[in-house]
């Protein structure tokens, strides 16, 4: 756990969050941003970078993100990640965005 990491603090129960899914290794929470009706974040409970998430944990996190997306957005959903400043990655803790609940068009935001 990183004391400065908001996601680590959510996992530890030190910060509030609307938890959509949780197991021993993965958590899915509602994003505080509400650009579309379904806007979730899927991540490992252990602190990982975005690169570590994709290189070491994407199979498990991806399967769960797909399952949650399919359940909540039967008309379709989008999974994405931002890598680095230019892509507007705002949190160091690696995570996948699950977006849906409406027609997303070519881009969101």
Model regions: which residues?
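HIT superfamily nucleotide-processing domains
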Residues: 1-109
């Amino acid at each position: 756990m990183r004391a400065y990491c908001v996601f680590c603090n959510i996992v530890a129960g030190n910060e509030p969050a609307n938890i959509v899914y949780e197991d021993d290794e993965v958590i899915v929470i509602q994003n505080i941003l509400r650009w579309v009706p379904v806007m979730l974040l899927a991540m490992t409970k252990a602190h990982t970078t975005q690169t570590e998430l994709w290189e070491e944990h994407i199979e498990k996190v991806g399967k769960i993100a797909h399952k949650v997306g399919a359940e909540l957005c039967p008309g379709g959903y989008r999974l994405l990640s931002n890598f680095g400043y230019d892509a507007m990655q705002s949190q160091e803790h690696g995570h996948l965005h699950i977006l849906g609940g409406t027609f997303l068009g070519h881009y969101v935001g």
